[in-house]
């Protein structure tokens, strides 16, 4: 089926979203045009508003409409803990755990092959934040991928001479998981990171 230039433009625009391929973009575009034009207008307005008004928190670098995000603006948070994450979605995920410390959001992970070194992801800013704060512990919560592990190792090495404790989130068998279904790498991490049972 051949689409008009405007429909083709809409389909191409929708394809920039993660996980949206050609067929999904076509279905979305046709749905908006045939069944939900008012929803399409709301989507366009919300997208425009967000792109114009959402920036980055000046302290932790997560997405925020204000100079300080809600977590950084909250005086009740624990100023002794700093959790380092790879992106804003990680802040949301960790917030669901009840964590009450502060955050620092990297711009991804180290990837020399892609030209992403320490400066590109914000390591100098992280070091400045640690030096300026009263943090006792830096919790590295990068993804358990090769790049995430390399980033965590680099941060830990860089902070080794500071007065803060550097820790890494645990990796391993998920709660409710069955060992026979867990991959070897995950199980290996779980065994290496074992801890005593508190009675």
From Swiss-Prot:
A Pfam family: RecR_ZnF
SUPFAM superfamilies, per the entry: Recombination protein RecR
Disulfide bridge partners, by residue number: none
Zinc finger (C4-type): 57-72
Domain Toprim: start-end pairs: 80-174
Entry-linked PROSITE patterns: RECR, TOPRIM
Coiled-coil region: none
Entry's Gene Ontology molecular function annotations: DNA binding; zinc ion binding
Biological processes, Gene Ontology terms: DNA recombination; DNA repair
Zinc-finger found in the keyword field: yes
Family membership noted in the UniProt record: Belongs to the RecR family.
UniProt-listed NCBIfam families: recR (TIGR00615)
Function (record text): May play a role in DNA repair. It seems to be involved in an RecBC-independent recombinational process of DNA repair. It may act with RecF and RecO.
Protein name (database record): Recombination protein RecR
Source species of the chain: Azotobacter vinelandii (strain DJ / ATCC BAA-1303)
């Amino acid at each position: 089926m051949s689409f008009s230039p405007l429909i083709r433009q809409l389909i191409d625009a929708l394809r920039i979203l993660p996980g949206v391929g050609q067929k999904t973009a076509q279905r979305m575009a046709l749905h908006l045009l045939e069944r939900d034009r008012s929803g399409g207008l709301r989507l366009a307005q919300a997208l425009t508003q967000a792109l114009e008004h959402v920036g980055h928190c000046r302290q932790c670098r997560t997405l925020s409409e204000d100079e300080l995000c809600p977590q950084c603006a909250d005086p009740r948070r624990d100023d002794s803990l700093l959790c380092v994450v790879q992106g804003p979605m990680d802040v949301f995920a960790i917030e669901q755990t009840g964590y009450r410390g502060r955050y620092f959001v990297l711009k991804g992970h180290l990837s020399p092959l892609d030209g992403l070194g320490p400066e590109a992801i914000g390591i100098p800013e992280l070091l400045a934040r640690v030096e300026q704060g009263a943090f006792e512990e830096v919790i590295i919560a990068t993804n358990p991928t090769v790049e995430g592990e390399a980033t965590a190792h680099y941060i830990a090495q860089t902070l080794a001479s500071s007065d803060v404790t550097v820790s890494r989130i645990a990796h391993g068998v998920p709660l409710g998981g069955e060992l026979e279904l867990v991959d070897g790498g995950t199980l290996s991490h779980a065994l290496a990171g074992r801890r005593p049972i508190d009675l």
